[in-house]
């Protein structure tokens, strides 16, 4: 291929936006196609690129003890537009990186529109391109026509599961005579970070009544032929409750690390947490409360939570279908479709789960495609890095027969020899993983600084 060859990227979510940015910064001309706002989806509200539709959290930012924090570090080192923009629109969230979602998406959109090597067009793509380097990053809400085309080419049905979306509450409707502000274990370097969450306490009787209401509430029904397979990291709360009455109390409603200033001598039996959803602090999402309850049921059930008895909702929860391909069967180690190697896949459609994981796969696909167009060969990506471990998992490390969406985690990394196992050795083990990864990532990335006369991120 030649440097004049254009790269087509279908889908302007986290992965597609990152792929476009990376390839364009390496000197490749990119055409980015996004179907919104011409074709809308259930979950999206705008036509912005990189719109966040579920949580507003990029999760832990700890690059020494957490695999997703390490992924943040690797992406920042590679001039990620998603990470740089997230850093510019961060919200207090203790040790996590939470983002003001609308200004974030608007900023990513503006940066990509302003890039001289990126052309953005809007409209639906309904078939696989017959030729030309292409990245498909259409995400969990891939249009039905394109999904059918992918399924025909793959020779198998696309796998499917369902994502649920958490509700968002107006802050001024929360009863702060009952609720209080505190991050778990007072995490954070500033008072604002240490008070990043609003907490609503429940007694045992209130918790039991809440569980009863969850289990009996009206739920959204699936269409004929659809079955409910859920990713464990985004389970609806009522599905968690069905797994056991105490499941929520040891999950999103765990009461640990919190002290109620209204009644410091009494330990709550369970706690519902809300996390700031915008910079103004006027909106809060209910952490871990993805749901498929009907809208009417949500209003009734959530009003049972002390502090939310008069809550007003900016958005109620919902459920949407999430499709992904069997990547270990269909993709090679360069993320190319084996049967049509001019096509790469990236993002959530490949079977990674999470905003950052999706964007990171876009980062890799964009760099791999750009190198190919420029006639260069990238060195093999070490599986000791977070991105290397993740792409190795989806392109062959996982069992194709049981393949399910995966967050990045240290279980995907090759072991570091000579380290103590078990809980007691965990801190040293994780630090060894991240030190090794950072060195390997730097070594892999450094030779690419001159690739195509690459440009720095804004």
Swiss-Prot record:
What does this protein do, in the record's words? Catalyzes the folate-dependent formation of 5-methyl-uridine at position 54 (M-5-U54) in all tRNAs.
Query: Cofactors per UniProt?
Result: FAD
Query: Where does the record place it?
Result: Cytoplasm
Q: Which UniProt keywords apply?
A: Cytoplasm, FAD, Flavoprotein, Methyltransferase, NAD, NADP, Transferase, tRNA processing
Listed EC numbers: 2.1.1.74
Q: Quote the record's binding site residues for FAD.
A: 11-16
PROSITE patterns under this entry?
Answer: GIDA_2 (PS01281)
Give the species this sequence originates from.
Answer: Jannaschia sp. (strain CCS1)
Instruction: Give the protein name, as stated in the record.
Output: Methylenetetrahydrofolate--tRNA-(uracil-5-)-methyltransferase TrmFO
**Cystine bridges:** none
* Main localization (coarse): cytoplasm
Q: Give the catalytic activity.
A: uridine(54) in tRNA + (6R)-5,10-methylene-5,6,7,8-tetrahydrofolate + NADH + H(+) = 5-methyluridine(54) in tRNA + (6S)-5,6,7,8-tetrahydrofolate + NAD(+); uridine(54) in tRNA + (6R)-5,10-methylene-5,6,7,8-tetrahydrofolate + NADPH + H(+) = 5-methyluridine(54) in tRNA + (6S)-5,6,7,8-tetrahydrofolate + NADP(+)
- InterPro entries found in the cross-reference section: FAD/NAD-bd_sf, MnmG-rel, MnmG-rel_CS, MnmG_N, TrmFO
A GO molecular function held by the record = tRNA (uracil(54)-C5)-methyltransferase activity, 5,10-methylenetetrahydrofolate-dependent
Per the similarity annotation, which family is this?
Answer: Belongs to the MnmG family. TrmFO subfamily.
Question: What's an example GO BP annotation here?
Answer: tRNA methylation
Among the Pfam families in the record, one is: GIDA
Q: Which GO terms describe its cellular component?
A: cytosol
